Amino acid sequence: MKTYLFRSHMKNTQRILLLIGCFWALLGSAQKDTNHHLWVNVIDAFTGQALSLDRNVKVDLLQLDSTVVSSAICRERRDQGSGERQMIVTFSVPLQKDPRFLLRASAAGYATKYVPVTLFWNKRFAESSKDISLRRTTASDAAYQLGEAKVTATKIKFYNKGDTLVYNADAFQLQEGSMLDGLISQLPGAELKPDGQIFVNGKKVESLLLNGRNFFKNDNTVLLDNLPAYMVHRVEVYNQESETSKLLGHKVDEGQLVMDIKLKRQYSIGWIGNTEWGYGTEKRYLGRLFALRFTPQSRLSVYGNLNNVNDRRKPDGNGGWGDFDPSGGLTATKRGGFDYSVYDKRNRFRLEGDVNASYTNNDNQWGGTSTDFLSSGDVFNAVSSRQQTSSLNLSTNHNWKYTNQTTNNGASFSPWFSYSHNDYHSNFRNGTFGVKPLDNYAEVLDSLFSPEWTTTVRHLIRRNGQQARGNSDGRDVGASYWTFIKIPQSRDGFSIDGHVQYVHSKSGEFNHFTYNHLEQEAMQTDFRNRYNYFHQQNTTVKARLKYFWHWTRNIYLNPSYTLQFKRSEGNHSLYRLEFLPESEGKDLGWLPSQMESLLQALDTDNSNESTLNNWSHQLTLDWQWNKYVKDENFRTLSSWNVTVRPDFVYETNRFDYRSANDPQHLTPGYWLPQFYFQLKRGTPSLRHRLDFDLSLITSAPSVTSLLRRTDTADPLHITVGNPDLKRKLDGNVSFNYRADQWLQRKERQLYGSAGWHITHNALAASYTYNRQTGVTTTQTVNVDGNWNAWMNLNFTLPLDRKHRLMFTTASSVNFYHTVDYASSREQEHPVRTTTRATLTSETLRLNYRYKSVNLGLTGAATYNHQASTLEGYASPNTWNVRYGLHAVVDLPWHLQLSSDLTMFTRRGYETASMNRDDLVWNARLSKSLWRNQLTLMVDAWDILGNLSNVNAGMNSRSMWEYYTNVIPRYAMFRLVYRLNRQPKKK
């Protein structure tokens, strides 16, 4: 039967490939172009930048005897991928007997230059590009200094230039002393997360650049926290071309969405630096140092900061505080590092990298209540936790790249290394009840864990607590590589890329675990003195060969083959130290001095070693059709982009699981086909941008979940393996819309998205809850019926002619349909339950700016409704509302006052104390001295003392309402000093 299915599958695959091949052939035969298309870009030999338009740049195509074949005046255009300005001329040359020609380039103030060029022709399509560098004939020519367009006539906030969204930084009024994060938080359509992630128009920014180049590539927070906002000229958002696309001269992939921070001219060369120091009440402190040196071909930056004010959680100038950070707590951070970049003006080579070090202390306390939904009746938990952690992190990343401008070949090598060490100790308490306690969680736990606690607590299911201390170490070392070779006299090429990685980690934890439950009308006690040791090392080797076939002018075929090998070796040893008589009365962290004694305490049922060898073969057929309509200046007027990419993946595993009781050997293999389709449309005059995406992705279950074993290492949460797990299939459909030129001149912004995701054979946890003991037994199973849908719409527009009053609305609706299995002990099999959840949110902003006054109103509301097929399910409805106002006002004598007042409202929660209103007020007064080189500030944080971190939410299985500790209100005096030193003009 399996053989028949395999043959049937192969026949269907062959038919599909045959149809695709015929389709390509038909398209190819219909679009033959025998002319050679030559693109010429004229640049300055010294700066490496395109010449200015007023230079009257001209290029002649000559035969070897100097006979003029064609002549043209260069036109200015912006590269759609990198945003770079170019002076371009194009020639369409029919087939010639002699393929050798001369290019003659001339421009006012520059020496004429002759460059030989050899053209080629083929049956499908021939195209090539050439850069010509001209040298100036005068030593100085200030009249022709290159410059960039400035938005000075009006303080327009944003506009589109081709495929680039440009924000004018000077149009935003910020608090004195604001860093880059304060600016980005105010950009229309941009969203800044607490961890430094940036989203623009709903899409994640993959890289944050400084003047077009990487800056601490793996950590956005360095630039966000240390670059002063006053240095920024523009913020540009665009899809950056990949290195392969640049070398081929045409788009072969989507590249990556980047946010490029363009500095003002006076800060783009020389030394700049700033330092800030502050001290306040409640022993709050802050210190920061940042220095940056620019030259035309290099950059060096150094930073360092220390603080205990949780500076990732702060007002954003729009009445908001960013998203809730579940790590929370009180954090003291010390971090520093440096970044370097060296490159030549012709982009032949680039050396860049960074080194980072950080040391963090965190005190995280949280507590509250939660409700677990069960078919036989809900259970209620009162819980509290405190964990103190210290972490040391070191990392370094480097990139070395070389490009041959003559052959358009390139290569890069990127090594990395990171090290981390963590120490922690924690205390956890929990009480589980069959009926919701009347007292608040703190009173319940204090009574439950007091020395005089009584075993006759009403409705108690279990009492459990744990004290723990431990540490962990981790190292990650590896390197990625990339090589591209362009086929001579063609638009084709191939690349070889991949990476090698080794990850090593180990950890050890001591914990004292106490568990009490009622059984046969007697309170049972389970005490465990445990030592957990983990050791893991992973090795990955990956290589890919990809060919880029320029089929016709508009059609590309990019097949690739990827081979990947992963080896994982692990060791988990659990020691039950309470089995040793000498452990009685010992403090947490005790180990016997002899290894023989330690081995006697080994829990053989929950200790194991394992080795996994995984091989993955992937064949990808990437077909693209791109159609652009351009004007005489090479600006895109409309576009079509279609991508069809089927992937054929075969994965094999060899898993050796070694334990004292049940060693196992597994060799699962999977076919994991994938399919991706994308359609992108730029309507005429680029008035609208439309994107449609469809994907089907098959994935295999984790090999460890296929083991036939029962893990009882945690006596309250038992897990059971499932050898019968199947592959899952994820289907995604999404549509994105963005208004482009349609609303650009009116300074309006409109974008939206809608999508649907469904999973076949989704992996879900089927669990059984024992109401007598409070023990949960979980097994991973396949389920059908999981899907979710969403829709988002965002709109920004001015409400007056002079664009002083701006209005922004952001709406979203998310619907979740979730299926899983749950039961209590009274039922034989877990019951299939279906949960439907609707999450709706709306944010409104109104901002007024006139001269030195910036006022704003903000309102946001989130509504969450949930229903379930569980018997007796309460169908909760919760509201989270935020509204307030903020202001930034410039006063006489170089003073500035900024303040925000926000009301946080919560409704619909089970705990009465959660349904509350918190009014939060912050203010800052600053004064600038010495021509703005020195700034004095006084901050007042949470003046009314109402700020609270509340983590409240729900899913298909539970609802929770937790409080975390927050920074107490404080006042701080801060001093900021700025330094800008430019090289002397010769």
Residue ranges and their predicted role:
Residues 213-241, 296:
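Short acidic/polar hinge/loop motifs at secondary-structure boundaries
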Residues 36-48, 132:
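A short, amphipathic beta-strand motif
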Residues 37, 218-221, 241-283, 298-986:
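Primarily recognizes Gram-negative and organellar outer-membrane beta-barrels
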Residues 47-72, 160:
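Short, ordered, surface-exposed loop/turn motifs in non-cytosolic proteins
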Residues 62, 106-108, 128-170, 193-195, ...:
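Short, acidic, small-residue-rich periplasmic hinge/interaction motif at the N-terminus
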Residues 66-68, 87-90, 94-119:
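A short, solvent-exposed loop/turn motif at the edges and junctions
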